[in-house]
A protein has these predicted regions:
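Rossmann-like dinucleotide-binding core of oxidoreductases
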Residues: 32-39, 45, 49, 53-74, ...
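Feature captures the FAD/FMN-dependent oxidoreductase FAD-binding
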Residues: 108-177
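Beta1-alpha1 glycine-rich phosphate/pyrophosphate-binding loop at the start
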Residues: 3-8, 40-133, 239-240, 306-312
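Core beta-strand elements of the Rossmann-like FAD/NAD(P) dinucleotide-binding domain
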Residues: 159-169, 208, 361-370
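Glycine/threonine-rich phosphate-binding loop and adjacent beta-strand/alpha-helix elements that clamp
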Residues: 374-445
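A conserved short coil-to-beta-strand element within the FAD-binding core of flavoproteins
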Residues: 135-150, 344-361
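Short beta-strand to alpha-helix junction loop
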Residues: 103-122, 288-295, 321-333
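Helical element adjacent to the flavin cofactor pocket in flavoenzyme catalytic cores
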Residues: 116-133, 327-352
Length: 445
């Protein structure tokens, strides 16, 4: 009995009305298994938050034939890779976690990277996912076998050995933050100093006393620039456009509150819900031509204009676009850092890189010892560089050549039983992406 029979019997396709609700769905799964139907084999790509969430919910639903393919040597995804100084969440900790795996003892309002990574690792132990992990194994291509009704996965391990395996369902949990983007700037390869991306931080390189340059000022730079400024001899920030930076208000949670959350889970749930609705209310700020957005932009400019002077220009401080066009950042130490005597903000475009520094459009060269890219990720190239071939030989890259799109950000016609978590048009600028992922997984399961 095939997995298609299993899915049909659960969905009601051949036996009755569609299943509604988790309890009814779980009973249907068990009934289908008892009838001898084979549960689907599910391949999950990526062992970050999305991949772990999918594996947990599939297992809780009675689907045990799950494999997580991870090209790295451990779980954690972006929280494994991003270890730069100051790395932390910009969503309150109690909402940057899954509702089914609450953590009442978060140390701070905005958890640091090591604590988030520890939380994700704990999910593997709590839900016994060790046997599902296929670390140091990368999926290079996916192709749909119409005759067998399965996906064929091309795999390569750490030793370069290539194999092929089958799966009835594929869940891509690669996300949008796995491939660092470094712009193609003339002369980059000629630079004599040290160069690295913030997502590949060089912890062996000592920045103390150095002349450091940062290209790209966004969500990562807003966190690592202040500690770098404190240790570098000089720091030049090459900024294309100013950001909206709201106060962070980070603070440690007192022991009594952590104890209360542990003793009374409903109290923590109420606190989590209050965070969600408070953040969700901010969406109105980001609507095009919204009155609230215009008010925020006006107040923001009014608050920052007193900082404009010989050191900082209006262009370097005040955005020339409405709130929400870029992610609104949060920090308490950003503007004090810009006012430091060893920090310079450059708004002229980067023209080229020389062996000794960076030349901007005004013709001026800033000599540097180290260049750090805070230029984000190739977040619009979903599933790249993996090749995905669906029904009738259609290539997903070809389908998306004019822009990526998917039903609910999850699935694309012509690619059966292929789901994407954190897919096209699912990024958020105001709330928790883990909440989004959990809802997508619930729909997918």
């Amino acid at each position: 009995v095939t997995s298609n029979n299993y899915v049909q019997s659960v969905s009601g396709g051949v036996t009755g009305a569609p299943v509604r609700g988790r309890a009814e769905r779980d009973r249907a799964f068990r009934a289908a298994a008892a009838a001898g139907a084979r549960p689907p084999r599910v391949a999950i790509l990526g062992a970050g938050a999305g991949g772990l969430c999918a594996a947990i919910q599939l297992r809780l639903a009675g689907i045990d034939s799950v494999s997580i393919y991870e090209r790295s040597d451990g779980v954690g995804g972006t929280w494994r890779d991003n270890t730069y100084p100051g790395a932390a969440c910009d969503v309150p900790s109690h909402l940057y976690s899954f509702s089914f795996a609450s953590k009442p003892d978060w140390s701070r309002k905005f958890a640091p990277q090591p604590e988030i990574l520890s939380y994700l690792k704990s999910l593997v132990d709590t839900y016994d996912l060790h046997d599902t992990l296929r670390c140091r194994t990368e999926v290079t291509d996916l192709s749909w076998d119409e005759v067998g009704g399965v996906w064929i996965l091309g795999l390569v391990d750490a030793d370069g050995r290539r194999t092929r395996e089958e799966a009835d369902v594929v869940v891509s949990a690669l996300g949008q933050l796995n491939r660092p983007f470094v712009p193609d700037i003339p002369g980059l390869e000629e630079f004599n100093g040290r160069v690295f991306h913030s997502a590949r931080w060089d912890h062996d390189h000592d920045l103390r006393g150095e002349r450091v340059g940062v290209i790209g000022i966004g969500a990562s730079a807003i966190q690592f620039v202040p500690p770098v400024a404190a240790m570098a001899r000089s720091l030049v920030l090459f900024q294309r456009s100013a950001n909206y930076v709201a106060p962070r208000g980070d603070r440690p949670y007192p022991s009594w509150l952590r104890a209360a959350f542990t003793r009374w889970p409903r109290l923590q749930r109420a606190y989590r819900d209050s965070i969600y609705w408070r953040l969700e209310a901010r969406f109105n700020l980001m609507r095009k031509d919204s009155r609230l957005g215009r008010m925020l932009a006006s107040q923001f400019a009014k608050r920052l204009r007193p900082l404009v002077g010989n050191k900082l220009s209006e262009e370097s401080l005040i955005p020339d676009y409405p709130p929400g066009c870029k992610r609104i950042l949060i920090a308490d130490d950003w503007y004090p850092t810009l006012l430091r005597s060893n920090v310079e903000v450059v708004t002229d475009a980067v023209e080229r890189i020389t062996p000794s520094g960076v030349v901007t459009a005004d013709g001026q060269e800033r000599p540097l010892d180290t260049l750090i890219f805070g230029t984000g990720f190739t977040s619009t190239e979903f599933l790249a560089p993996m090749r995905v071939t669906g029904r009738n030989g259609i290539d997903l890259n070809e389908v998306w050549k004019d822009g990526a799109a998917a039903f609910l950000g999850l699935s694309v016609p012509g690619f059966p039983n292929l789901f994407m978590l954190y897919g096209p048009n699912t990024n958020l600028g105001h709330n928790s992406i883990l909440f989004m992922i959990e809802q997508q997984v619930g729909y997918m399961v």
